[in-house]
Each structure stands twice: as structure tokens, then as C-alpha cells.
Amino acid sequence: MTTTEFPSAIAKARFVRVSPRKARRVIDLVRGRSVADALDILRWAPQAASEPVARVIASAAANAQNNNGLDPETLVVATVYAGEGPTAKRIRPRAQGRAFRIRRRTSHITVVVESRPVKDQRSAASTKARRAEASKTAGRAPAKKAGASSGATKMPPKKASVKTSEASETKGGSD
């Protein structure tokens, strides 16, 4: 667990009946995103593990709001991971008296949300103006690449193999 300089809240769901590997697949989609974005992504994710992960994120956001008095608009999913819980072992009967083992895996899902300051949003017009200014300055003085001037780093072109008429004559038969 990492210590943070931002105020945070934690929520855990233990013994969730989903494989940790499948939960991690969903968790990787939302790590580092805002809580609203994360819940929106999980709402439309087709994986079955998205529902319990969304519940834990919503619980962490509620903990942050109710227990710590944090603003829900500034909450970001800072840390989220799925650990392995106990595995229930079951038996599936198979042909000729055999029995195969079924592993019902569980996971412990932990979410830490932090209240981070909102980054200032730039308007589309200011972004266009900034890009236009950057392209003007780049057009005036093109920068030379340092590695392009040295000829020692380039590889010489490969020589093409030339077929001779003797090689093609002896190809078909044996002498």
C-alpha cells in the first residue's frame, strides 16, 4: 500500500465469487480514471467481473463522501487490485468412474480513491491557437537531428544475389 499526500478512502470486497485473473482484466480498464468515468466504463463492459468491481468503486466513493467529506467530483481511482481469495474445490463426475476437480476461485477486491485537484480544462479555441503557434515556430527554423548527420551509424545496403546461367543449368539434373 502506498502512502499518498491526497485525502483518500478505501473499500474492500472480500470473497467475491469471481476469478482474480478475470477481475484484473476489468480492473486494468479503470485504474487512474475518475470515479465517474470508471463507473461509466464498467457499466458498459461485457465482462461479468465488471459488476462487483463497480460496486466496490461506488462503495469507496461513498466512503470518501460520507466518512471523509470529500467532493465526489474530484475523486480518482488511485489504487485498485484483486488478490486471490480461498479456492473452493468441487468434483465433477466423468466417464468410467473418474472425477475431475473444479476450482471455484474467489478474490478480494480493494479500491483506494483519492481526492485530486481538477486539472484546468483548455477550450478548443485555445488548443487550436497553441498548435498553430507551435507549427509556425517549427516552420521557421527546422531542427536538425543529431544522429542523422553521422554516416557511421547507417548500414550499407545489402548486395543483391545474381544467378548465373551455369547455376540454372545444373539445377535440374545431375551429372
Swiss-Prot record:
Keyword Ribosomal protein on entry: yes
Function of the protein: This protein binds specifically to 23S rRNA; its binding is stimulated by other ribosomal proteins, e.g. L4, L17, and L20. It is important during the early stages of 50S assembly. It makes multiple contacts with different domains of the 23S rRNA in the assembled 50S subunit and ribosome.
Gene source species: Mycobacterium leprae (strain TN)
Subunit structure: Part of the 50S ribosomal subunit.
GO BP terms in the entry: translation
Residue ranges with Low complexity bias: 136-154
Name used for this protein in its record: Large ribosomal subunit protein uL22
GO molecular function, one term: rRNA binding
Highest rank taxon of the organism: Bacteria
Disordered as annotated region, ranges: 113-175
Biased composition annotated in UniProt, kind: Basic and acidic residues: 166-175
HAMAP family: Ribosomal_uL22_B
Keywords: Ribonucleoprotein, Ribosomal protein, RNA-binding, rRNA-binding
Family assignment from sequence similarity: Belongs to the universal ribosomal protein uL22 family.
InterPro entries (UniProt xref): Ribosomal_uL22, Ribosomal_uL22_bac/chlpt-type, Ribosomal_uL22_bac/org-type, Ribosomal_uL22_CS, Ribosomal_uL22_sf
CC terms in the record's Gene Ontology section: cytosolic large ribosomal subunit
